[in-house]
Amino acid sequence: MASAELRIINRRIKSVKSTKKITRAMELIASSRIVKAQQRLTSSNNYTNLLTQIVEELTGSGEMPTSPAIEGTKKITLVVITSDRGLAGAYNTNILKLAEIRKGEYENLGNQVEIVTVGKKANGYFKYRNVEPKQNYEGITDEPNFENALQIMTPLVEEFYEGKTNQIELVYTEYQSAMTQTALYKTVLPFEVEQIAKEIESVGGYTFEPSASQVLSNIIPKYTNATIFSALLNASTSEHAARMRAMKAATENAEELIKILSRQSNQARQAEITTEISEIVGGAEALAG
């Protein structure tokens, strides 16, 4: 009996050690990827912040982009950015919860909401709930590039100016540090002056030629593309950070479980030895008697 128990425990130890090797490897991979992702995010933020300064000045001049008026229901497009893969803790769960909240809030006001998903997790989530995304993009979130941003945003901006949608909103995870990432939403179009003002203090002193309106029409595509690209980079960096933490926690849990199972193995081995000694002593006494 003790021998059978010992074999079971040892098999579990072997299995947990194998799992630990995998989680440790995934932790190291995520750790290496996050460094590169942070560098790309920092570079992107410099460009995005400059565009934000200019847009703030333009919107402050009274020039605001608008969607053609639509009678009746207002149309909202939510761009939900998740990952293609799991094993990233609550990363995807937090985003999808927020997306559901935003969708519900808009629908409760009588608006029509369309979903654009980035990442397999978002696509699978909404399809499972009988919500067919208008468009789905996969294979982007690991290492997004500017072409991905153009691919996502260009048709949406066209729809905005054609009156097919009145508002474009991103739902994604903002990277703050390796330990802190926050799920949030951000309106891309129409511009929200207060939101832009909070993001960065206006430097002032711009003179627009030939007019603020013409400059704005030229800069809107750059601004919207930079905004979605920044969101993709934030999401990617946050995903790597979340996966690194999740795999680190899994590795530590595996180490703790191995310690517990090793103690159980030692106890089972001691019990087996004690039983064998008792059987030998008992047999010797029987022969002597």
Where in this protein do the model-derived segments appear?
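C-terminal beta-strand-loop-alpha-helix "lid" module of Rossmann-like NAD(P)-dependent dehydrogenases
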Residues: 1-289
